[in-house]
Design a protein with these regions (language model features):
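Alpha-helical transmembrane segments of integral membrane proteins
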Residues: 2-6, 100-133, 179-329
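Hydrophobic alpha-helical segments of integral membrane proteins
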Residues: 3, 11, 51, 55, ...
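Residue-level signal for discrete positions within transmembrane alpha-helices
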Residues: 14, 99, 103, 139-142, ...
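Hydrophobic alpha-helical transmembrane segments of membrane transport/permease proteins
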Residues: 18-70, 160-189
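Juxtamembrane/transmembrane-helix interface segments of polytopic membrane transporters
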Residues: 21, 25-29, 153, 157, ...
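Transmembrane helix irregularities
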Residues: 32, 144-147, 266
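An internal, D/E-rich "acidic patch" concept
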Residues: 61-119
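Membrane-water interface segments at transmembrane-helix boundaries in multipass membrane proteins
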Residues: 139-207
Length: 329
């Protein structure tokens, strides 16, 4: 299969998957118990049956389901998700846009750091299979890989910002920056990084184990290939075999997992942001669930799904460029 045809097929699959997600997103929030109009007016002086009926009509919920879907599809394609119930009067697109920056900073930097550390540990553990370093690193990475992010986050919060650990006030307990602080330039950057440190550390440790284990197993598989034995028989130095022949071939599976995890890390970021009160999309998701903010939840669900689909698409395309055998299959 040619490169263009392969990419076109993957793009088509991604678009079909995204279309399915849009349909699922529409029906999901219509089978959840609760009347959106009543939720919007609850707690206000205007909460009465007449006003609920009027709001139901304004939201278009009194129309037949096929007509509702057509309106929903048109609004979704134009990124019009309506107004938030939780943040009254604010457009969902604007709310998400304000929160996406902190989450992208957290997810992008933690992914790069965890991938780098995981690859290094996995390479040396696989190359020295059976050594003390291999056994010790496997135990550590398996532990952090199986550890829930929220539980580890609570421990880190207690140790470094909760007032009861060995370093009770080393870092802020939460937030994105110091409230009311008039900072600019390096002072602002330093303040943001100080608040980022603890949630960043939790995500790095949580995902480093996965990358390390995959890299180690992939490296061991490549070491059993015939070309490695041939290189050794020719007298090629061990370091040269490792870095020029084994590592490049072993990187492909790990590379794919790292790209795919860019989408799934948003899931881990939800719990971590909630623990540290970090004002990103994760904390916003929890707040939207608590308040049953259907328009906001629809926008967030679509965004998270699109992130996974796009990451999967990029991984498929780049993998096919690195390994042409994928296109042939």
């Amino acid at each position: 299969m040619g490169t263009r045809r392969y990419i076109a097929s993957k793009v088509l699959q991604a678009l079909l998957t995204l279309a399915f997600v849009m349909v699922f997103n529409f029906f999901l929030f219509r089978v959840i118990p609760g009347d959106p109009a009543a939720l919007l007016l609850r707690g206000t002086a205007a909460f009465n049956p007449q006003n609920v009926a009027e709001v139901t009509k304004e939201l278009g919920l009194d129309k037949p389901l096929p007509q509702q879907f057509l309106v929903y599809a048109q609004d979704t394609l134009t990124l019009n998700f309506g107004d938030s119930f939780f943040l009254k009067g604010q457009d969902v697109k604007t709310v998400i846009g304000e929160r996406i920056g902190p989450t992208m900073l957290l997810v992008a930097t933690s992914t790069i750091a965890s991938a780098a550390l995981g690859l290094i540990i996995g390479i040396y553990a696989g190359w020295r299979r059976g050594s003390r370093f291999d056994v010790g690193s496997q135990g550590f990475t398996l532990f952090v890989y199986s550890m829930p992010e929220f539980w580890f986050g609570i421990l880190v919060l207690m140790a470094f910002a909760g007032g009861i650990g060995p370093f009770p006030s080393l870092f802020p307990a939460g937030g994105y920056s110091t409230p009311g602080a008039d900072l600019s330039g390096f002072g602002h950057v330093s303040d943001v990084l100080n608040h980022l440190a603890l949630p960043w550390f939790v995500l790095v440790v949580a995902y480093m184990g996965e990358y390390s284990l995959i890299m180690r197993n992939s490296l061991i598989d490549v070491m059993n290939d015939d070309f490695v034995m041939t290189a050794r028989a020719k007298g090629v130095r061990e370091k040269q075999i490792l870095w020029r022949h084994v590592v490049p071939n072993a990187l492909l599976p790990t590379f794919t997992v790292v790209l795919l995890s860019l989408g799934f890390i948003f899931g881990g970021a939800i719990t971590v942001e909630y623990v540290f009160s970090y004002p990103g999309l994760g904390l916003l998701t929890v707040q939207a669930i608590d308040s049953k903010d259907f328009p906001l939840l629809q926008g967030l669900f679509l965004l998270f799904s699109a992130a996974v689909i796009i990451a999967n698409l990029i991984a498929d395309i780049l993998y096919s460029r690195l390994d042409p055998r994928v296109r042939a299959g």
